[in-house]
């Protein structure tokens, strides 16, 4: 094992470590403050644009989340909107992540966290009076109301053990009844398995998905009110998910074969409804007697409608690159939520009451004055790598190349407020669709996993090199797994990027599984304790591949001191090693944000500092200093 001179920085309970880290961060922030103060107003303007999302409907009316300078759960009845809860009531830098409603419209629940933590509180309240009827602490999700104040929920255990003794990370389903909890599903599931739960649209059945990381799923289902009768309905050794109950059969998506996704019925056997179409099947809902499915074509979404026997009815395409960010059904209708690079949202309500109709119920006008064009770069092995180019109306000489490339996450169009900040400051922005995502199906994802992870880095290098060759100053930007990407790129090709911005990153690939919940990522990255996996991990691990005497691009590394998903030690150690070799590197440590985000004000200030570092670094480069 190689000696790790900065291992002590993993102990963020040590006051000396915290003091050093905060001191380094203060130096970074003070250095950037004159320029950052000029940018923060611009950033806050875009982060305060209201965005409506997560629409659903029950007997009480239309529910949705709203994000502007706060987060809120809202109820709309006959055009009049009522705020049920706002994050301003919940504490400093509170974020409402999700909400849940019962079928009758009497109760709702919401889960919120403070300062970007993954651990927070679930609150159950009455819709009419807003009186709180229950609270649960933890990492809570997937609430399904049963009536009579009873409900299921899933709880993710980050440390210690699950109630059945399995070592964390692990997840279980609980029944909450009168303030008492009973574990009803998941007993004995090994660590690093996740459980998701939802009810069929008619509330008759529970639909359960057990996932081993992002590699394979097992599906369970049964009567909603009788958890002892939930049984395995499908296991195939690949990714899959249940959609709904339709015509007495379970409708599911299987990512077998070429792994683009096909729709099947599960019953006494498996019968195919809609075969693979050569494009990624992202999700589907049942609305009345129709199936509405979202597909991805070159990283943009379109809708395909089928009847319940799988016969095609129609396709719905959009005028510009778009993402279907949310599909939900309430039986006779449903919602399709769209995202764009240039405008925040568009919401369409689908109705099956008289045939099938689509009606726009909410939208925000265009706010980014740029055009979106598409292109391809050729990776080292001949693979064509798609990208979106958000291009200013006037020519630019600076481009930010953003990537992720992992965990089956597709970088489809989305309104990210940092993009117009860069556009207004004279940059173009490129979003690269690298292997490791699912833009081209699960095979595309698998081509960027484990020992094939280097494909992701080479894909990014191909896209960035194309713009570098065209004369652009190239800025590399990535967050989380995308931070790993940028860290790997600057250690593999130190001369490629003119500036690097690495956010909330995973950078030590030999220790990630021992820091916080990192072992949950073993299915994606591999196991550092396995000699075969360790052999390829050490070859690209950014922290282990910083070399003395090499000039790396100016780099800002930003993270949250209390990020409880990706340990801040990844950032601290990488920073210390880069700085120790005399590189221009800046550490920004946020104390009010974590992996789960924070208030728009906190994020706007963080973005302003990151952009200020980039501006400062490019200015020095242009002056030749």
Residue ranges of predicted features:
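A flexible loop/linker signature enriched in serine peptidases of the S9 family
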Residues: 66-71, 89-93, 112-121, 136-138, ...
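Non-catalytic accessory segments flanking enzyme active sites
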Residues: 17-100, 111, 193-224, 230-243, ...
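A conserved hydrophobic secondary-structure block that centers on an alpha-helix together
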Residues: 84, 90-142
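Beta-propeller blade signature
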Residues: 123-126, 169-178, 220-224, 264-266, ...
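Hydrophobic beta-strand positions that form the internal "hydrophobic ladder"
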Residues: 62, 108-110, 151-152, 206, ...
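Cap/lid segment of the alpha/beta-hydrolase catalytic domain
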Residues: 88-97, 116, 362-475, 479-480, ...
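Conserved loop/turn motif of beta-propeller repeat scaffolds
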Residues: 59, 104-108, 148-149, 203, ...
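Active-site-proximal cap/loop segments of hydrolase catalytic domains
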Residues: 434-625
């Amino acid at each position: 094992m190689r000696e790790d001179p900065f291992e002590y920085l993993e102990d963020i309970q040590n006051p000396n470590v915290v003091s050093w880290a905060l001191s380094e961060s203060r130096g970074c922030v003070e250095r950037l403050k004159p320029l950052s103060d000029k940018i923060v107003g611009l950033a806050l303007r875009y982060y305060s644009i209201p965005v409506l999302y997560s629409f659903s409907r029950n007997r009480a009316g239309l529910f949705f989340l709203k994000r502007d300078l706060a987060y809120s759960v809202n109820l709309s009845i006959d055009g009049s909107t009522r705020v049920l809860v706002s994050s301003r009531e919940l504490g400093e830098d509170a974020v409402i992540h999700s909400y849940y409603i019962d079928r009758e419209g009497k109760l709702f629940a919401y889960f919120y966290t403070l300062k970007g933590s993954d651990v927070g509180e679930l609150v159950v309240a009455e819709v009419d009076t807003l009186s709180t009827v229950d609270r649960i602490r933890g990492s809570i999700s997937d609430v399904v109301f049963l009536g009579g104040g009873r409900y299921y929920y899933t709880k993710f255990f980050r440390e210690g053990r699950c109630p059945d003794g399995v070592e964390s990370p692990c997840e279980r389903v609980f029944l909450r009844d009168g303030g008492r909890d009973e574990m009803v599903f998941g007993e004995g599931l090994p660590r690093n398995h996740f459980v998701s739960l939802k009810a069929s649209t008619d509330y008759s059945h529970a639909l359960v998905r057990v996932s081993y990381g992002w590699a394979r799923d097992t599906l369970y289902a049964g009567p909603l009110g009788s958890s002892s009768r939930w049984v395995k309905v499908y296991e195939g050794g690949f990714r899959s998910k249940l959609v709904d109950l339709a015509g007495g059969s379970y409708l599911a998506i299987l990512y077998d074969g070429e792994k683009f996704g096909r729709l099947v019925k599960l019953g006494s056997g498996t019968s195919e409804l809609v075969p693979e179409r050569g494009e990624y099947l992202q999700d589907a809902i049942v609305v009345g007697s129709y199936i509405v499915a979202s597909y991805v074509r070159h990283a943009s979404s379109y809708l395909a409608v089928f009847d319940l026997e799988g016969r095609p009815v129609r396709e719905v395409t959009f005028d510009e690159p778009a993402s279907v960010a949310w599909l939900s059904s309430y039986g006779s209708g449903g919602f399709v939520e769209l995202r764009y690079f240039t405008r925040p949202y568009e919401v369409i309500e689908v109705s099956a009451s008289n045939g099938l109709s689509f009606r726009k119920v909410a939208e925000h006008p265009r706010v980014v004055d740029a055009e979106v064009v598409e292109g391809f770069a050729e990776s080292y092995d001949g693979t064509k790598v798609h990208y979106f180019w958000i291009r200013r109306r006037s020519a630019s000489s600076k481009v930010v190349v953003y990537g992720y490339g992992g965990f089956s996450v597709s970088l489809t169009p989305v309104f990210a407020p940092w993009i117009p900040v860069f556009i207004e400051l004279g940059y173009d922005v490129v979003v690269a669709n690298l292997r490791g995502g699912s833009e081209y199906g699960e095979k595309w994802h698998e081509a960027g996993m484990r020992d094939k992870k280097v494909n992701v880095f080479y894909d990014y290098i191909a896209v960035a090199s194309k713009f570098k060759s065209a004369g652009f100053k190239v800025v590399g930007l990535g967050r989380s797994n995308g931070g790993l990407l940028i860290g790997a790129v600057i250690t593999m090709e130190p001369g490629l990027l003119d500036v690097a911005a690495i956010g909330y990153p995973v950078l030590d690939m030999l220790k990630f599984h021992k820091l916080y919940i990192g072992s949950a990522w073993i299915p994606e990255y591999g196991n550092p304790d396995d000699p075969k996996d360790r052999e390829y991990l050490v070859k690209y691990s950014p922290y282990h591949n910083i070399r003395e005497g090499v000039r790396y691009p100016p780099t800002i590394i930003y993270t949250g001191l209390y990020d409880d998903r990706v340990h801040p030690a990844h950032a601290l150690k990488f920073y210390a090693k880069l700085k120790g070799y005399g590189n221009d590197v800046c550490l920004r440590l946020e104390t009010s944000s974590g992996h789960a985000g924070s208030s728009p004000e906190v994020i706007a200030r963080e973005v302003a500092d990151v952009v200020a570092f980039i501006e400062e670094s490019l200015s020095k480069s242009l002056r030749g200093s």
